[in-house]
Regions:
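Active-site PLP attachment segment
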Residues: 259-294
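Active-site phosphate-binding strand-loop segment of PLP-dependent enzymes
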Residues: 82, 188-241
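Conserved PLP-anchoring active-site segment centered on the Schiff-base-forming lysine
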Residues: 151-170
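Conserved N-terminal alpha-helix of the aminotransferase class I/II PLP-enzyme fold
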Residues: 93-142
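Structural motif of enzymes handling amino- and sulfur-group chemistry
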Residues: 307-323
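N-terminal "arm"/small-domain region of PLP-dependent enzymes with the aminotransferase-like
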Residues: 2-105, 237
Length: 323
């Protein structure tokens, strides 16, 4: 199978229709934009542009799509993270409709000012009940990406340290960059390497945040959370676990890899994403109430973004009840 994919990648038609997704400035003439535009015109002209293909219905295992040529295809989808099918579950959709009828289309405001509705508080309560820990709270964000961006940049500041697994999701990396903290990387799931990194930091006199994931979106494997948390706490570092791909599907009660590896009470912050198993959109941090209250006020991606729309919020509450 490996030989098959190696040969496929070597074929000129394959390489011709792909392009590096890491954009780099080419100077004042914007050459990189011109290069991309030329490439996109070439692949769309050949009907080979495979990104942003519109779906003609719900995100089900079997989907219908329309290419830019206008041709329609019925396909089996292997790309969705609608793991439990909640995005089109009739009870979830009905709950979203009822919330939409009652609250309207959008929150039309920042959650810190005028965008928090009672249904948002109900979702927060349901999440706390779902995890079942005393003195914990939830801070809601309009996306999982925004949650990582806001939480890391609110917790870490210039002079502090963020330590990331090399396989970290882009939102963790971007949050670390935005924080202006010092960034260090450790080899994927390698706690011996992590310890070497932490030893090099003046851990007694600086704040450290170690970020890892329950299930890594880049590799699809589980984070070695028990050892990562033990080593991190040994050096006084807080640990953020992104459970985006693992909530509702991992752990005896669906509480993620933290539950499965018995570290739920030891992770300092847990990030949840509502666009995967929950079937909606949005995200949150679940942590001690002191932390979540702080994030409500200081996480800029929350403060300066519109709150979750009420319809989606109603659907998310039903997803948790069904789980």
């Amino acid at each position: 199978m490996t030989d098959f994919f190696d040969k496929l990648i070597e074929q000129e038609p394959y390489t011709q229709y792909t392009l590096d997704m890491f954009s780099r400035s080419a100077g004042k003439d914007h050459a990189e934009i011109q290069q991309f535009d030329k490439w996109r015109q070439m692949v769309t002209g050949a009907n080979k542009y495979t990104f942003e293909v519109p779906h003609l219905g719900a995100q089900r295992p079997e989907i219908s799509v329309r290419r830019e040529s206008g041709d329609e295809y019925n396909l089996i989808s292997f790309s969705s993270y609608n793991y439990l099918g909640y995005s089109y579950h009739p009870e979830v959709v009905d709950a979203a409709k009822k919330a939409l009828d009652h609250y309207g289309l959008g929150a039309t405001g920042s959650p810190l000012l005028n965008g928090t509705f009672q249904i948002h508080k109900e979702l927060e309560d349901r999440i706390v009940e779902f995890f079942g820990q005393k003195d914990y709270g939830v801070s809601l964000f309009s996306s999982g990406y925004g949650a990582n961006l806001g939480v890391i940049s609110a917790f870490i500041h210039k002079g502090d340290h963020v330590v990331l697994d090399r396989s970290s999701h882009a939102s963790l990396i971007d949050g670390a960059i935005l924080s202006q903290g010092k960034i260090s990387l450790f080899r994927h799931n390698d706690t011996e390497f992590l310890e070497k990194v932490l030893k090099r930091i003046d851990y007694e006199n600086t704040r450290i945040l170690v970020c890892c994931e329950g299930i890594y979106s880049t590799d699809g494997d589980y984070g070695n959370l028990r050892d990562i948390i033990d080593v991190s706490h040994k050096y006084g570092a807080a640990v953020l676990v992104d459970e985006a791909h693992s909530l509702l599907v991992a752990g005896e009660n669906g509480r993620g890899v933290c539950e499965e590896q018995d570290v739920l009470s030891e992770a300092d912050m847990i990030i949840a994403t509502f666009s995967k198993s929950f079937g909606g959109v949005g995200g949150c941090i679940y942590a001690n109430k002191k932390i979540t209250n702080y994030m409500n006020y200081y996480a800029r991606s929350r403060m300066f973004s519109c709150a979750l729309d009420p319809g989606v919020t109603g659907g998310l509450i039903k997803s948790i009840k069904l789980a």
